[in-house]
UniProtKB/Swiss-Prot annotation:
It comes from Coprothermobacter proteolyticus (strain ATCC 35245 / DSM 5265 / OCM 4 / BT). Keywords: Cell cycle, Cell division, Cell shape, Cell wall biogenesis/degradation, Cytoplasm, Peptidoglycan synthesis, Pyruvate, Transferase. Pathway: Cell wall biogenesis; peptidoglycan biosynthesis. Its main location: cytoplasm. Cell wall formation. Adds enolpyruvyl to UDP-N-acetylglucosamine. It is found in: Cytoplasm. One of its GO terms (cellular component) is cytoplasm. It catalyses: phosphoenolpyruvate + UDP-N-acetyl-alpha-D-glucosamine = UDP-N-acetyl-3-O-(1-carboxyvinyl)-alpha-D-glucosamine + phosphate. The active site is at C115. PANTHER family: UDP-N-ACETYLGLUCOSAMINE 1-CARBOXYVINYLTRANSFERASE (PTHR43783:SF1). This is UDP-N-acetylglucosamine 1-carboxyvinyltransferase.
Length: 425
């Protein structure tokens, strides 16, 4: 177990470059299983979930190497059963459903893991792939799928604009015969970037970034060289950390389009934000934020992944804030940890009512998932005194070198093992 020791209350300052987008990388790595030729990816984030996806590709028979970029060379695909590959540990592995059904016509995949944030159903994935001709069943905790006659293009209406379901259907549609239409598709960064990757591989896609996406399938998909764009969630994390510590940070290398919902809410709270060239955001030193109301929604709404972090910021805002979580039904696990730091938060169902306090106080806290852990790091950075964040391995699933980046921004942090933490804390 990894532990982050934080001596808080220091305004962050400096510049940080956003890592490659975690969620885009996971989708593209799954889609790379469609390719008959070499795929070379740059700006791939050095994080745990990416390494798990690399391991899955190797188990399928691909040669995967990481140098200045990530190279994926196809071999003879020798496996379609992913039950012993670590695939069950991350949600992103679910995207191998569409990839292997398209490429091999069969797949066995453990039910996906990932963050513990309530119910995350896969019914929309299964519904979409079934409409494309796949036979899918849940057996012994595994998803067993077959498409002996191959996948066929279909019209798929999503009851909810699920990012994962949109991605899975796009990946499957790339090798399906005919055209696949996804209505009420997700419009998030990783969906757009997956589409750009598939298009770079020669797949014809229309409507990318809109609610209706059309994919014209191909018989074979070649290789490509592709650069993954900056991670808007990581960029947002550092922007929120700057606001929470009353500091000033510039984040570059990110498409501000996907940050606008966050930037609007920061400005509403009284935080001064400057956008430069559409790829750089500066958060300027600002006074104590004002209470605001946030409701998470699929993009272009406010991103659920930044909800826990905004709660850490608003815990010291002036007045009352209300945050309603509509995407996941269990994304309030960080509240009990913020209580330990002195936050005044009441939870009613999926709504948190936050009465701002003057300051948080450092305390030992436990991260139980990726974004909750990042929220506790932000809280620790802004708090007075020392905080000890246990469970940092969850955070490092999505943030590369977070402790080193924070140090470069003047934060006083140290990443240690839990055994070392006993002596330091």
């Amino acid at each position: 177990m990894s532990v982050l020791i934080i001596d808080g209350g220091i305004p962050l300052k400096g510049k940080v470059t956003a890592q490659g987008c975690k969620n885009s990388a996971l989708a593209i790595l799954a889609a790379a299983a469609l390719c008959e030729d070499r795929v070379y990816l740059t700006n791939v984030p050095d994080i745990g979930d990416v390494k798990t996806m690399m391991s899955i590709l190797r188990s399928l028979g691909y040669k995967v190497t990481w140098g200045s970029g990530l190279t994926i060379k196809p071999g003879v695909i020798k496996n379609y059963d992913l039950t012993h590959t670590g695939a069950g540990s991350i949600r992103g592995s679910l995207l191998f459903l569409g990839a292997l059904l398209g490429r091999l016509g069969k797949v066995v995949l453990p039910m996906p893991g990932g963050c513990n944030i309530g119910t995350r159903p896969i019914d929309l994935h299964l519904k979409g792939l079934s409409l494309m001709g796949a036979s899918l069943d849940i057996q012994g905790g595994n998803i067993v799928g077959e498409a002996p006659s191959g996948l066929k293009g279909a019209y798929v209406y999503l009851d909810f604009p699920s990012v994962g379901a949109t991605e899975n259907i796009m990946i499957a549609g790339a090798l399906a015969s005919g055209e696949t239409t996804i209505e009420n598709a997700a419009q998030d960064q990783q969906v757009v970037e997956l589409g750009k990757f598939l298009m770079a591989c020669g797949v014809k896609i229309h409507g990318l970034g809109t609610k209706v996406i059309r994919i014209k399938g191909k018989k074979e998909i070649g290789g490509v060289t592709f650069r993954i764009s900056g991670d808007s969630i990581e960029a947002g994390t550092y922007a929120i950390a700057a606001a929470a510590t009353r500091g000033s940070i510039t984040v570059d290398g990110v498409d501000v389009t996907f940050l606008r919902p966050l930037l609007f809410k920061l400005q509403e709270a009284g935080i001064e934000v400057v956008v430069t060239n559409g790829h750089e955001v500066t958060v300027l030193p600002s006074p104590r934020p004002k209470g605001i109301t946030i409701k998470t929604m699929p993009f272009p709404g406010f991103p659920t992944d930044l909800q826990p972090l905004m709660m850490s910021l608003l815990a010291t805002a002036e007045g009352r804030s209300v945050i309603t979580e509509t995407v996941y039904d269990g994304r309030m696990g960080h509240v009990s940890e913020l209580w330990k730091m002195g936050a005044n938060i009441e939870v009613e169902g999926n709504t948190a009512i936050i009465t701002g306090v003057e300051k948080l106080t450092g305390a030992p806290v436990v991260a139980n998932n990726l974004r909750a852990g990042a929220a506790l790091v932000v809280a620790g950075l802004s708090a007075e005194g020392r905080s000890v964040v246990y469970g940092m391995e969850h955070v490092m699933r999505g943030y590369s070198n977070i402790h080193q980046k924070l140090r470069a921004l003047d934060a006083k942090v140290e990443l240690v093992s839990d055994e070392e933490a006993v002596n330091i804390a």
